[in-house]
């Protein structure tokens, strides 16, 4: 049994962590922080968790209290984890950061895209990028894991078999991705009102989304050594639904192979990647509240362009569920522990 703390427990990723950890047999959540809600019981804010956290109260985030944990999750906006991480790690506590603070290795690139000076650049090189399907061995011994973003997870898992086998032109990559509104967090914004985005579908951040450098860094990591630098055109969209991501990926093939067999063999031993049968395409509802990434691969009209459809739940495999998957690996638990429930339907 390990003691877990959560910094930033009132956002969507924080409450998703609470939901999933409530049934994890090897975890006790002993600390949860929120400056705004300090002193309140968790179940006062989240009645769905009654019976699981009736004695757990929000507190101010203090490093000495976090030092009593075995592991701390940061479910905070960017900029928060980097201000506290040095003290947490110095106390011998391992950490999983769900924010973007430690994902991008090039500090200048991070500062450009996130618009602020990085508060703890010396720890960036120490952080392990927490995409288990690619970095499982490094995650096992990591003190600090940077959990991938939601779009990066869906896109990297879709391109991985193709780039790792040098089967596509890395300068031809396109990702058209769509997310539910929970990916934008809980802030009150006019463009996220039901009257504004309901029954509608739109492109946003087409000129440059801050997940782009993270994705391209991850794509480079999975390539063969002599491959050209990946160039990705990434266009995100907003869907009028709460949770889920659908990424449609395109690339030019440079070698003809049995794509279906390639994907099935490549992911045969991955518990959270499901390659659908040939001719079956994934739906976001098929992964709702689950830690599964579902993939389909095809070559439409046999014209040399491979298309991959990739779906995840942005709050689960795209955030908190993947964080718990990383935790399981770090502490030697079964990787699927606490994450085996199937998707919700309807």
UniProtKB/Swiss-Prot annotation:
GO terms for molecular function: N-acetyl-gamma-glutamyl-phosphate reductase activity; NAD binding; NADP+ binding. SMART domains: Semialdhyde_dh. Pathway: Amino-acid biosynthesis; L-arginine biosynthesis; N(2)-acetyl-L-ornithine from L-glutamate: step 3/4. InterPro entries: AGPR_AS, AGPR_type-1, NAD(P)-bd_dom_sf, NAGSA_dehydrogenase, Semialdehyde_DH_NAD-bd. NCBIfam families: argC (TIGR01850). This is N-acetyl-gamma-glutamyl-phosphate reductase. Its main location: cytoplasm. The active site is at residue 150. One of its GO terms (biological process) is L-arginine biosynthetic process. Keywords: Amino-acid biosynthesis, Arginine biosynthesis, Cytoplasm, NADP, Oxidoreductase. It comes from the Bacteria. It is found in: Cytoplasm. It catalyses: N-acetyl-L-glutamate 5-semialdehyde + phosphate + NADP(+) = N-acetyl-L-glutamyl 5-phosphate + NADPH + H(+). Catalyzes the NADPH-dependent reduction of N-acetyl-5-glutamyl phosphate to yield N-acetyl-L-glutamate 5-semialdehyde. Its EC number is 1.2.1.38. GO terms for cellular component: cytoplasm. Belongs to the NAGSA dehydrogenase family. Type 1 subfamily. Gene3D superfamilies: Dihydrodipicolinate Reductase, domain 2, NAD(P)-binding Rossmann-like Domain. Pfam families: Semialdhyde_dh (PF01118), Semialdhyde_dhC_1 (PF22698).
């Amino acid at each position: 049994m390990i003691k877990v703390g959560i910094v930033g427990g009132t956002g969507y990723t924080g409450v998703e962590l609470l939901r999933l950890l409530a049934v994890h047999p090897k975890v006790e959540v002993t600390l949860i922080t929120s400056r705004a809600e300090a002193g309140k019981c968790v179940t006062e804010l989240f009645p769905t968790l009654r019976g699981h956290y009736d004695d757990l109260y929000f507190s101010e985030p203090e490093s000495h209290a976090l030092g009593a944990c075995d592991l701390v999750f940061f479910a905070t906006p960017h900029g928060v984890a980097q201000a506290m991480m040095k003290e947490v790690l110095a106390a011998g506590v391992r950490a999983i950061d769900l924010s973007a603070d430690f994902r991008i290795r090039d500090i200048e690139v991070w500062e450009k895209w996130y618009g602020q000076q990085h508060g703890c650049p010396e720890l960036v090189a120490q952080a392990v990028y927490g995409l288990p399907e690619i970095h499982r061995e490094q995650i096992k011994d990591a003190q600090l894991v940077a959990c991938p973003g939601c779009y990066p997870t869906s896109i990297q898992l879709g391109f991985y078999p193709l780039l790792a086998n040098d089967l596509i032109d890395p300068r031809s990559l396109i990702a058209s991705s769509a997310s539910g509104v929970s990916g934008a967090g809980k802030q009150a914004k006019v463009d996220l009102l039901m009257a504004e985005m309901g029954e509608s579908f739109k492109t946003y951040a087409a000129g440059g989304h801050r997940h782009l450098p993270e994705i391209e860094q991850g794509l480079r990591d999975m390539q063969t050594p002599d491959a050209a630098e990946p160039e990705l055109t990434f266009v995100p969209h907003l869907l009028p639904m709460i949770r889920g991501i659908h990424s449609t990926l395109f690339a030019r093939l440079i070698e003809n192979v049995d794509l279906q067999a390639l994907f099935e063999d490549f992911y045969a031993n991955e518990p959270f990647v499901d390659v659908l049968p040939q001719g079956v395409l994934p739906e976001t509802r098929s992964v709702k509240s689950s830690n599964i990434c579902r993939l389909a691969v095809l070559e439409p009209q046999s014209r040399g362009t491979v298309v991959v459809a990739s779906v995840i739940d942005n709050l689960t495999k795209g955030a908190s569920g993947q964080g718990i998957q990383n935790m399981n690996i770090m502490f030697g638990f079964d990787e699927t522990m606490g994450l085996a429930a199937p998707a919700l339907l309807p």
